[in-house]
UniProtKB/Swiss-Prot annotation:
Catalyzes a reversible aldol reaction between acetaldehyde and D-glyceraldehyde 3-phosphate to generate 2-deoxy-D-ribose 5-phosphate. Keywords: Cytoplasm, Lyase, Schiff base. Pathway: Carbohydrate degradation; 2-deoxy-D-ribose 1-phosphate degradation; D-glyceraldehyde 3-phosphate and acetaldehyde from 2-deoxy-alpha-D-ribose 1-phosphate: step 2/2. It is found in: Cytoplasm. The active site is at D102, K165, K199. One of its GO terms (molecular function) is deoxyribose-phosphate aldolase activity. Its main location: cytoplasm. This is Deoxyribose-phosphate aldolase.
Length: 258
C-alpha cells in the first residue's frame, strides 16, 4: 500500500463525517449514516445537529455500526458568551444521546480581552458532559493571531476540554496547517497529549491534505498519538476523496463542501 493510501485509510477512520446545514433533513442524516460505513472501515463518528441524534442512533444500530459515535454541536456557530444558554444546549445534547459534543468557544469575548467567560463556559459545559467527550471549537480563522489562538487553546485545556478544534466551518477561513501547528504545540507544551486531542475542521478536502495534517501530528506528538481518541477530521467532502484514493468506487459520499 502506498504512503498516500495508508494515510487515506488512517484518515478515514479518524473522520467526524459531518452535515451541519440549514437544510438538513432526516433523509440526509440517514444517508450520512450509510456513508459512515464504508467497505474499508467506518468513520470514527458522524457530526450532526442535536435534533437528528435519535434518527442517527436508530440508523447506525440498524445498519450494524452502533460503534460509530454521534457528535453534535452547541453554542453553534456564533460562539456567544451566554454561559447559561451554552450549558443548557449541552445538557440537551447529552439528553438526546450524544456521544460527543462540539461546543463553540466565546472567541469574540477573548478578542475583546475577556478570558474568564471562555474558561467558565468550557468548564460548565464539561461538567454537563461528564464522561461524554467535549470538543471545543476556538474559531482560529477569526482569532487569526498566534497569541490569541494559543491563549484560547490553553484556556480550553485548563477548563477541561477533551479536544481542541479549529473551526465551525461557517466562517471564511477554517482549518489551516499553520493554525493546526499552533494548537498541537500547545498540547505538547502543556504536557497534556495523553488526555487532550485535536480536530481540524473545514478545508481538509483531499487525501493529500489529510496526510499532511497527520504527518504534522506525528512530528509534534509522536507517531502513536493520533488515534481516534486524540485526533479527528471534521469534514464531509473529504470522504469521497479518501475512498477514491483507496480505489473504493461503489460508495460515494455527498460532496457538499464543509
Amino acid at each position: 500500500m502506498s504512503d498516500l493510501k495508508a494515510a487515506a485509510l488512517r484518515a478515514l477512520k479518524l473522520m467526524d463525517l459531518t452535515t451541519l446545514n440549514d437544510d438538513d433533513t432526516d433523509a440526509k442524516v440517514i444517508a450520512l449514516c450509510h456513508d459512515a460505513k464504508t467497505p474499508v472501515g467506518n468513520t470514527a463518528a458522524i457530526c450532526i445537529y442535536p435534533r437528528f441524534i435519535p434518527i442517527a442512533k436508530k440508523t447506525l444500530r440498524e445498519q450494524g455500526t452502533p460503534e460509530v459515535r454521534i457528535a453534535t454541536v452547541t453554542n453553534f456557530p456564533y460562539g456567544n458568551d451566554d454561559i447559561e444558554i451554552a450549558v443548557a444546549e449541552t445538557k440537551a445534547a447529552v439528553a438526546y444521546g450524544a456521544d460527543e459534543v462540539d461546543v463553540v468557544f466565546p472567541y469574540r469575548a477573548l478578542m475583546a480581552g475577556d478570558e474568564k467567560v471562555g474558561f467558565e463556559l468550557v468548564k460548565q459545559c464539561k461538567e454537563a458532559c461528564g464522561d461524554i467527550l467535549l470538543k471545543v471549537i476556538i474559531e482560529t480563522g477569526e482569532l487569526k493571531e498566534e497569541a490569541l489562538i494559543k491563549k484560547a487553546s490553553q484556556i480550553c485545556i485548563e477548563a477541561g476540554a477533551d479536544f481542541i478544534k479549529t473551526s465551525t466551518g461557517k466562517v471564511p477561513v477554517n482549518a489551516t496547517p499553520e493554525y493546526a501547528r499552533m494548537m498541537l504545540e500547545v498540547i505538547r507544551d502543556m504536557g497534556v497529549a495523553e488526555k487532550v486531542g485535536f480536530k481540524p475542521a473545514g478545508g481538509v478536502r483531499t487525501a493529500e491534505d489529510a496526510a499532511a495534517y497527520l504527518a504534522m501530528a506525528d512530528d509534534i506528538l509522536g507517531s502513536e498519538w493520533a488515534d481516534n481518541m486524540h485526533y479527528r477530521f471534521g469534514a464531509s467532502s473529504l470522504l469521497t476523496n479518501l475512498l477514491n484514493t483507496l480505489e473504493v468506487t461503489d460508495q460515494v459520499a455527498d460532496p457538499a463542501a464543509y
